[in-house]
C-alpha cells in the first residue's frame, strides 16, 4: 500500500511540474509519466484518467493553501494587537507560502482558470474552503461578505503571484507590504475590529 501511495504522490508531483512548465494542453499522460520514468498505465491504475490525476493534484494544492492559512489564523484572535497588525501577521506567512512554491502556483493558475476546473473541481474547491470560510466569518460583519471577500483575497494573491512569476514584479518586502495594504484597505470596511 505504501508503494502505491508513493506512486500516487510522484505522479501528482509530475502532473504539477508538467502543467507548470508546459501548460494544460501539453500535459499528456505520456508527458506526465515520462517525468517520473513510469509507464502511463500507472496513471490509469492510480487515478483512472488524466483528468482525475489533474483534479487530485489541484485538490492537494488547494488543501495545502487552506491548511497553511488555518495554521496561522489564530493570530486574528490576539486582542492586544490592532486589526491591521493581526491581518499583517496572517498575511506574511500566507504570502510567503504562496510565492515560495512557483511550480505549484503556475500549475494552480493554469488549472484554476481552465474549463476543466469549472466542470470538475469547482465544487471541490468550495468544499475545501468551507472550514476556512467558517473560521474567517467571525471577523466580518456578514458571513455572506466573508465568502466574497475570501474569494477576492484569494484571487488577488493568485494575480500578484503571477506578476512575480512572470518577472513583472520582484518579490520584495516592500512589494509584499504594498499588496497587503491594497487587500487590507479593501477588506477593512467589512471587518469587525
Description of each model-found segment:
Residues 59-66:
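Short, basic, alpha-helical segments at the C-terminal edge of helix-turn-helix-like DNA-binding modules
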Residues 4, 8-16, 50, 152:
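Short, leucine-enriched amphipathic alpha-helices that occur as contiguous helical runs
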Residues 66-71, 100, 115-151:
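Amphipathic alpha-helical packing segments from all-alpha helical-bundle domains
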Residues 24, 47, 110-116:
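Short helix-capping/turn signature of helix-turn-helix
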Residues 1-6, 191-193:
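N-terminal intrinsically disordered/low-complexity leader segments
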Residues 106-110, 126, 138-184, 190:
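Hydrophobic/aromatic-rich alpha-helical bundle segments in the mid-to-C-terminal region
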Residues 56, 71-100, 153:
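Hydrophobic alpha-helical connector segments
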Residues 10, 18-52, 56:
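Helix-turn-helix
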Amino acid at each position: 500500500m505504501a508503494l502505491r501511495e508513493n506512486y500516487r504522490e510522484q505522479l501528482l508531483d509530475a502532473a504539477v511540474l508538467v502543467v507548470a512548465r508546459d501548460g494544460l494542453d501539453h500535459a499528456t499522460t505520456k508527458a506526465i509519466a515520462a517525468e517520473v520514468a513510469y509507464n502511463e498505465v500507472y496513471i490509469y491504475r492510480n487515478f483512472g484518467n488524466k483528468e482525475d490525476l489533474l483534479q487530485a493534484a489541484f485538490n492537494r494544492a488547494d488543501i495545502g493553501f487552506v491548511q497553511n492559512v488555518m495554521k496561522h489564523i489564530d493570530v486574528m484572535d490576539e486582542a492586544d494587537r490592532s486589526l491591521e497588525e493581526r491581518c499583517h501577521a496572517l498575511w506574511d506567512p500566507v504570502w510567503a507560502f504562496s510565492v515560495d512554491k512557483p511550480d505549484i502556483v503556475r500549475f494552480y493558475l493554469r488549472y484554476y482558470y481552465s474549463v476543466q476546473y469549472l466542470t470538475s473541481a469547482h465544487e471541490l474547491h468550495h468544499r475545501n474552503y468551507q472550514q476556512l470560510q467558517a473560521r474567517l466569518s467571525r471577523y466580518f460583519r456578514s458571513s455572506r461578505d466573508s465568502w466574497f471577500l475570501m474569494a477576492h483575497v484569494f484571487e488577488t494573491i493568485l494575480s500578484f503571484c503571477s506578476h512575480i512569476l512572470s518577472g513583472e514584479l520582484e518579490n520584495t518586502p516592500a512589494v509584499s507590504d504594498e499588496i497587503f495594504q491594497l487587500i487590507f484597505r479593501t477588506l477593512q470596511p467589512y471587518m469587525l475590529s
